[in-house]
Amino acid sequence: MHVIVLGSGVIGTTTAYYLARQGAKVTVLDRQPEAACETSYANAGQVSPGYSTPWAAPGIPFKALKWLFQKDAPLAIRPDGTLYQWRWMAAMLANCTAGRYTVNKERMLRLAEYSRDCLRELRADTGIQYEARTLGTLQLFRSASQYQAAQRDIQVLDACGVPYELLDSARLQTVEPALARTAHKLAGGLRLPNDETGDCRLFTRRLAQLAAGLGVEFRYGQDVEALVAGGAEIRGVRVGGETLAADRYVAAFGSYTRGFLAPLGLELPVYPVKGYSLTIPLASAEAAPVSTVLDETYKVAITRFDNRIRVGGMAELAGFDLGLNPAHRRTLEHVVTDLYPGCGEVAQAEFWTGLRPMTPDSTPIVGATRYANLFLNTGHGTLGWTMACGSGKVVADLVTGQRPAIRADDLALARYQAAQTRHAGPALGERSAA
């Protein structure tokens, strides 16, 4: 079986690796000169199943309204001139009920926990090195109200069997010693000891090398134009004036997957949510975090690599704009210097932005389409690194006709089509017949 995978980010590369492990002939196509050049390039570095929480949650509509008028707010909305942006936001708001939150959180945790298990197995099998740390992650609360609100997530963690520790401010330094200097600013934290960290770009590029060793062909610098459909199947993919044919196809172009598949009549409910990061040279190990902390107020993560610190966060709904907003750099700098003063050479930091493919229910789109040989692996939002190995393994199983180890039917695009049948008129997820 020959499979063409479209995209060489962490999602496409893990998919290709698992397909090759299952005996498929695999070709990966990407416009970039090497793997992990776009959204996987400089993300926050967290592998955090326990923090797999839907953006669409009770209370978010009120918070979003407040953030619109707040300096250093974690969310910014800039009209991109399309009706789709507003339709997508409306669909997200429709998921901000307690019932939908519970359903979406369970699906996300299921995939994320499985993905972490797959990552650990892959690491044990291959010895892959990517500056990984298995010291857990710590969510920091600056106010008593945030600390109390964590009880809701704890109930879900209990139900899903996810270990955790709720720490008051005095105990924060027991897991993050450098916080001893700034714990007086904090109300407490929620620690998830099973979460991990690591450099996603380094992982992806080294996994691409391992996949190539299994026979995967990576064709970089490719002008991938379109898929060619014939009836209920895909017949090929047009690349730089030629058409390449395969038995199966996997679309993993991140935020660009929606536009790429639109000519086929598929409308993926994916929107590019812009995120920012700083990569800071380490100045003092004693002043730096030992793993990852997440500032709940600013929605900013601070992650320790070997000799670097990655600070990532923010969410900007502005279409496909990749401009660097200096105000967001100031926010990232403020958070890291406020919590970990003197930890790094902030003035020498690399400032970066990427587009995270987000769905209205925060759950990725993983699985089949109405085209018999076309599969999707996109829409992971801020959790692409966390969910990559599990998503890649699930898609590889589906493509090769094997049964996935976890329930996966409710991860597919069909969940949006099912919603359409329950309501009058077309909904996000599939175009109505013309």
From Swiss-Prot:
It is an enzyme of class 1 (oxidoreductase). GO terms for biological process: D-alanine catabolic process. Pathway: Amino-acid degradation; D-alanine degradation; NH(3) and pyruvate from D-alanine: step 1/1. Its cofactor is FAD. It holds the Pfam family DAO. Its EC number is 1.4.99.-. Keywords: FAD, Flavoprotein, Oxidoreductase. GO terms for cellular component: cytoplasm; plasma membrane. PANTHER family: D-AMINO ACID DEHYDROGENASE, SARCOSINE DEHYDROGENASE-RELATED. This is D-amino acid dehydrogenase.
